[in-house]
Amino acid sequence: MASNDSIKKTLGVVVGLSLVCSIIVSTAAVGLRDQQKANAVLDKQSKIIEVAGIDSKGKKVPELFAQYIEPRLVDFATGDFVDGNAATYDQRKAAKDPAQSIKLTAEQDDAKILRRANTGVVYLVKNGDSISKIILPVHGNGLWSMMYAFVAVETDGNTVSGITYYEQGETPGLGGEVENPSWRAQFVGKKLFDENHKPAIKVVKGGAPVGSEHGVDGLSGATLTSNGVQHTFDFWLGDMGFGPFLAKVRDGGLN
């Protein structure tokens, strides 16, 4: 009997310790997920501040973001601003929800993203009461990964003022050079559209002609990643992406 009692006590201790450990692990996992989400938000805000050309040295990114950046929701079909909480809207999640997105046909899907949310986010860069730039979030498939970037556009709705990739899994030293500041700098001053308002950015294998309004050099040794960048611009500047919104910007829609 004493032996049975001892076994029961031992089992009770083991079960109790297991429960305590599982609670600790679960709590730690939840805390870690929350921290990871917070870090992801901070990183995204930092990239938006960077591509907007705002000096963040010695300053807190969340405070700068709140001061200078205004997220707004845009209806892709019409290009109009729509009501909603742009600060908490998750466009990736919405794209996976059939009620909030559309499945793209092969003909529509230049960027190989499969689905597109019905509503997108743009970030307006504020200078006092005026808007100085627009930040467009874009993404498209590369060789190995989906590549996510922010493109800064002047208020003419046509001139690029910057681009930064904030999430990608391309080959380091090859396709991964989409993050290289020297390569990204080529986009500054380029025109997104031609005189007929058609998407005109060209990623040129072997190098863009000197003085080209629309061309940037392709990535050396990374043709498929370069193609992915090209297709990303083709899609998001087109009618299925931010094309209708940018057309309204060019017509003075921000005023």
From Swiss-Prot:
Keywords: Cell inner membrane, Cell membrane, Flavoprotein, FMN, Ion transport, Membrane, NAD, Phosphoprotein, Sodium, Sodium transport, Translocase, Transmembrane, Transmembrane helix, Transport, Ubiquinone. GO terms for molecular function: FMN binding; oxidoreductase activity, acting on NAD(P)H, quinone or similar compound as acceptor. Its main location: membrane. GO terms for cellular component: plasma membrane. It is found in: Cell inner membrane. It catalyses: a ubiquinone + n Na(+)(in) + NADH + H(+) = a ubiquinol + n Na(+)(out) + NAD(+). The modification FMN phosphoryl threonine is found at residue 223. It is an enzyme of class 7 (translocase). It is a single-pass membrane protein. Its cofactor is FMN. Its EC number is 7.2.1.1. One of its GO terms (biological process) is sodium ion transport. InterPro entries: FMN-bd, NqrC. SMART domains: FMN_bind. It comes from the Bacteria. Composed of six subunits; NqrA, NqrB, NqrC, NqrD, NqrE and NqrF. Belongs to the NqrC family. NQR complex catalyzes the reduction of ubiquinone-1 to ubiquinol by two successive reactions, coupled with the transport of Na(+) ions from the cytoplasm to the periplasm. NqrA to NqrE are probably involved in the second step, the conversion of ubisemiquinone to ubiquinol. This is Na(+)-translocating NADH-quinone reductase subunit C. It comes from Vibrio vulnificus (strain YJ016). The lineage of its organism: Bacteria, Pseudomonadati, Pseudomonadota, Gammaproteobacteria, Vibrionales.
